[in-house]
């Protein structure tokens, strides 16, 4: 049954992404040079309206839904088996599924699972008691301390780990606290309203809940307004402040680091730390010293509720969804089984991932995609060697970095096996299990990585993730199995379409190694300048063209893209398109293709690219993307990216007078 479902699902998606389905996806009443988005995917947009469960649809959503069905089938193999050995993969999956799906039990308990913790907060009398419990609850995963510590990589020697230190407390980006625009303010109000209702759900009257909500928000606002904005956070040098442990104790005396370290179970031999941002951490010191005890208790109570609200009764999850309706525009909550799949795939991601690739991503697929990645790598090398604006010195360093990139396809070469320490107990509730999982994973992480060399071949994501990633400190590109299927990668389509879809994704991730952030890391993943001053100036001039261009793009009426915030992703698309097209040209020399449905291979390349991003979305979702995401909205990743690409003009005969035409001298040429 499982294999049959797979074959049918694959065939259905394949039709949409194949060359034979091109015209069905299109709106040929529109000229490609006037509105390529509508021309390329207008038919698809009309045929695929949003359903109530999604704020955005499209290729990513389709694959995520397909994955949920597949993973659910895997889970069902263990859902009713209660006699499996404790600690076995099947026992963990089945037990966690049953705990999550027990709506009767969860609704009967209400907020009882967190009541003992709330009572502890309510009983606090002194500041010393508040801080002590704040640290202890942080160890349980309640995020009650407005700061934190955790194992991280040394940015200047990325094969070594160190302790990272930073502020907490701010759930939103800095812009939401400083000068929020209209759509950001709606998000703020939705969150504050949700927080107030949470407090009423645990027994407070309206006036008490209002006071406590405002107290918690005041603390969050004090921290959030002093954090770096989203553009500034893209500069690694602004988020790196390495100091000794002794210096941390001296510079931030308002935080009891030794007690916090010991409560959290971190090593006692910490010698250096990296503080991500200094100013907000000083704000935290002031908050801990000068905020009233009642307000600190309000902050803690709300964080106890919020940390695991998704594991409580339907009253909590339904109210949480009401806030999400305002934030994203989604109309209907996903059924419980889909939420269970998300929970299990998140908590037991590698355990599920092993089962997933066994059924849905054979070794032959891994090798086929790996060869495709190597083709793209060769195309990037060709373009770098032909680069006319870089000096030979910098070009040599760029080529070294490209050749040193580690490639992960489908699933990791070596599994991390961090989940073998996880113990799921059905005689405990979801929150008790979640607390123990968090603690066990933290301990296992320390055992595996503290004072030990880092294995940079690790993938850092699960095979069932529908996405792709570049890791600058590993200098690795990662393509999980779940994205390596139609319409991204289709074995039934010709290579022109595949290069325009998954080829651009691959080139995009490679380009991240040379975007405004990635270009600051060397071939070994260390933060180190490898540019001549003149070349870096030229680079900045070229990327500014891209940033300025995207800043002109209006996502929804009255709200434009921030070209500086999205620069890295836009460099990725710009480079990915050019690299993938070069790989397509290289292949054409060996295996020429003919027209299909009157479309040339070059046209099919760009139509496939547009198909990948085809999506309908609510205005709220698009606004949220512009406000809080480093990616441009899907439509703009087509309509603004392609006018920067010379070969797109050639493929469709686009010329001066067409609405999307940009003069050649005004186009961005980076990679």
Where are the regions a protein language model picked out?
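Short, solvent-exposed loop/turn and secondary-structure capping segments
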Residues: 23, 47-51, 174-176, 227-228, ...
């Amino acid at each position: 049954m499982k294999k049959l479902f797979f074959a049918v699902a694959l065939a259905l998606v394949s039709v949409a992404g194949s060359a034979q389905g091109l015209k069905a996806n299109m709106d040929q009443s529109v000229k490609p040079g006037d509105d390529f988005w509508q021309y390329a995917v207008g038919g698809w947009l009309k045929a695929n309206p949003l359903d109530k469960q999604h704020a955005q649809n499209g290729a990513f959503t389709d694959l995520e839904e397909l994955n949920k069905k597949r993973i659910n089938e895997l889970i069902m193999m263990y859902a009713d088996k209660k006699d499996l050995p404790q600690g076995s993969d099947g026992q963990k999956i089945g037990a966690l599924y049953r705990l999550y799906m027990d709506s009767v039990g969860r609704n009967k308990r209400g907020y009882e699972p967190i009541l003992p913790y709330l009572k502890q907060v309510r009983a606090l009398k002194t500041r010393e008691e508040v801080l002590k419990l704040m640290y202890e609850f942080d160890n349980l995963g309640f995020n009650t301390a407005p700061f934190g510590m955790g194992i991280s990589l040394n940015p200047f020697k990325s094969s070594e780990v160190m302790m990272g230190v930073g502020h907490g407390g701010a759930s939103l980006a800095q812009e939401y606290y400083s000068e929020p625009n209209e759509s950001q303010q709606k998000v703020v109000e939705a969150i504050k309203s949700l927080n107030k209702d949470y407090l009423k759900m645990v027994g407070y009257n309206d006036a008490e809940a209002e006071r406590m909500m405002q107290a918690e928000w005041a603390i969050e606002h004090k921290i959030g307004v002093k954090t770096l904005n989203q553009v500034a956070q893209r500069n690694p040098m602004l988020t790196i402040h390495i100091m000794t442990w002794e210096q941390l104790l001296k510079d931030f005396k308002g935080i009891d680091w030794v007690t916090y370290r010991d409560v959290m179970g971190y090593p006692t031999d910490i010698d250096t730390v990296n503080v991500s941002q200094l100013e907000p951490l000083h704000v935290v010191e002031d908050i801990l010293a000068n905020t009233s005890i009642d307000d600190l208790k309000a902050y803690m109570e709300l964080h106890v509720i919020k940390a695991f609200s998704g594991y409580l009764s339907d009253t909590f999850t339904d109210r949480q969804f009401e806030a999400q309706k305002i934030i994203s525009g989604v109309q209907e909550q996903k059924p419980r089984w889909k939420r269970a799949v998300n929970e299990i795939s998140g908590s037991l991601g590698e355990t599920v991932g092993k089962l997933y690739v066994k059924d849905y991503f054979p070794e032959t697929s891994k090798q086929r995609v790996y060869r495709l990645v190597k083709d793209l790598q060769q195309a990037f090398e060709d373009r770098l060697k032909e680069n006319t604006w870089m000096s030979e010195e910098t070009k040599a360093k760029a080529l070294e970095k490209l050749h040193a990139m580690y490639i992960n396809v489908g699933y990791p070469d070596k599994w991390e096996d961090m989940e073998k320490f996880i113990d799921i107990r059905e005689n405990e509730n979801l929150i008790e299990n979640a607390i123990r999982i968090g603690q066990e994973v933290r301990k296992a992480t320390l055992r595996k990585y503290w004072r030990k060399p880092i294995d940079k071949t690790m993938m850092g994501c699960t095979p069932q993730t529908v996405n792709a990633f570049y890791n600058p400190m590993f200098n690795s590109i990662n393509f999980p199995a779940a994205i390596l299927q139609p319409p991204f990668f289709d074995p039934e389509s010709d290579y022109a379409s595949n290069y325009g879809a998954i080829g651009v994704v691959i080139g995009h991730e490679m380009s991240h190694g040379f975007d405004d952030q990635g270009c600051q890391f060397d071939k070994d993943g260390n933060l180190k300048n490898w540019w001549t001053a003149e070349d870096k100036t030229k680079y900045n001039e070229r990327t500014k063209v891209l940033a300025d261009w995207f800043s002109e793009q209006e996502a929804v009426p009255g709200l434009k893209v921030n070209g500086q915030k999205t620069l890295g992703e836009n460099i990725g698309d710009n480079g990915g398109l050019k690299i993938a097209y070069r790989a397509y040209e290289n292949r054409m020399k060996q295996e020429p293709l003919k027209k299909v449905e009157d479309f040339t291979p070059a046209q099919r390349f760009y139509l496939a690219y547009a198909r990948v991003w085809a999506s309908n979305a609510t205005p709220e979702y698009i606004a949220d993307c512009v406000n809080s995401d480093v990616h441009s909205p899907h439509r703009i990743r087509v309509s603004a990216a392609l006018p920067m690409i010379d070969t797109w003009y050639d493929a469709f005969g686009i010329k001066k007078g067409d609405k999307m035409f940009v003069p050649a001298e005004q186009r961005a040429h980076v990679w």
